[in-house]
Amino acid sequence: MKRIVVLSVIAGCVAACTASRKLSMPENYPAFYKEGHRGTRGLMPENTIPSMKKAVEVGANCIEVDVYLTKDKKVLISHDPFPNIAHTLYNDGSEIAKADAKKYVWYQMNYEDIKKFDVGSKPFPAWPQQQKIKVGLPLLGELIDSVEAYVTANKLPKPIYNIELKTSIRFDSLKYNAPPAEVVDAVMEDVKGRNIGNRFYIQSFDVRPLQYVRKKYPQVVIGYLTTGKNLDSNFKSLGFYPHIYSPEFNLVTKAMADFCHSKNMKLVPWTVNDKEKMKRLIADGVDGIITDYPNYFAEIGK
């Protein structure tokens, strides 16, 4: 009973600050989102073109990428704002000292220099199944073009691209990324030049770019990432109900799924790397799962 009351309060609070706009998903979006996190991080170097190709090969219908702007205003695929020394080497194969990593902030570098880093050769103990290949960080447009060519050549279904904007107030102060609106506009310009139509959505933990997308690009699907347990606070911070709500998976309950569905939101939690937990979430009513192992979907019959 207490949970029902809380969810009713949330609905009232958000309705009060949300313009009347009925949520609807494009008809070509999947009934269930089988999302490859950073491609297939469990099997291939994260956020690389080979990782994305592997994801669609093993059955992902949606691939998630993280983006930053570079100094020369290009949309870079990377989870971290500078080299992650756990899996990044200099081009000659030498190690990057921990003290030196922050000398190479992507937003303060041109892409010609960024692409020289090797993000795929170094053994990564956290991901023992990950194939090791020498590969660099791609640009968003390059990645989309490569994946589209790959699925066409191999007669695979065309995926949805989940583009996560790595912005935050903290990153603003550290100059780790461009201002949110600038990142959004750059992503939209890149996507416009590709023949993918509406097969992408924009997500972030940062409410600012999502609010900007809703205002300037109302046709774009929005995903809201959260770690917060308080649904009331989460939705009031955003100011509207997104198309896709993506909480940390341990926060998901059947009541949350029911509430999301009552507001026409899709519930797609992150990041689930255990098959039994996947089954439990599906039983609770989630509309998709973000995982480092999209090959698991076939193994659980999804």
Task: Describe these PLM feature segments.
Residues M1-E27:
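Bacterial Sec-dependent N-terminal signal peptides
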Residues C17-K302:
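Phosphate-group recognition and catalysis centered on beta-loop-alpha active-site segments
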